């Protein structure tokens, strides 16, 4: 290629190569999170269900990857912006992508964009993948693989995509603009939606065989730590990339991500030490994730000291939800998707209403701590309530449809559950030479 072909001609505007590279790296980091979650959940599961648990996460990669290209992206971010609830159908199969690529090849930055819009398709696909994968943690050990796949496929298009539009659809979007709720990287869209969906489905499925009588200990603690480490690393792209350019706010989001996750880990270990008398690696890993969850809604809106406070607060709250609420109410959130992501996401959204720096706010409204004005806090709470209501109603409808399609039950039969889903559903074993306890 000659030098003349490398550079844009006079009058043409190139994309910002720094931000383009940054967003490409962030996108790849977020894609790493779903395999990381597979290890995290796989380690927490019982030995006889580890392959099923991990496959539910890996299966989401294929399922969401296809559906996002076909319709998910268009429903979330397509259209002309006239609808506050959903995108449109103008970008089905991502057909406009070719024009963007050709424009970029000619050295033209489409519409004055900082980087090619095509990156957003992949970046948001990775968000959709990790969100759907989080749901599977509540269902471990008893759900039909086909039923789970069918549910999540419909859920992606009917719940996740419209919710993403309502929060991140820009001017006119219902939650992000009309209500004025802030969600930097996915407190409402990712964590509350997935955690609440997990809770709803685990209530519909019922408790695992032996729940309350059998101790469901993590079968592979190093897997849990490995998964947490991959999630932690990927989360820098998750939060940092949500600024959508390489600037000081992206750097702030990354710093806050480290700060909150570290504080969450320390706080969890302290609570665990007081409650049980000993710190654990599973506890450290869970606290790390809880800290990541709580800072997600406000990663680019709060100061580092506030991220520290958020991390310190979230672990006792999530620990209580996991250790006490499940026992009190008797629901079987198997791998604590609701206890960590649902509760942590709600708390993060509320705390953003307290600690948001006015100058960093998308709406111009600052947190109560800075302004003494409760308007942003009210918007945050209202945004959470609306998210919960939408997810609750649509989840129940989708679950009823899928249940009817699968002969009235989303759950495997008792014999298959007792044998283990690895053998009964997949004919595989993670440890074929091991003959000990499950």
Locations of regions flagged by a protein language model:
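Glycine- and aromatic-enriched membrane alpha-helices
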Residues: 9-438
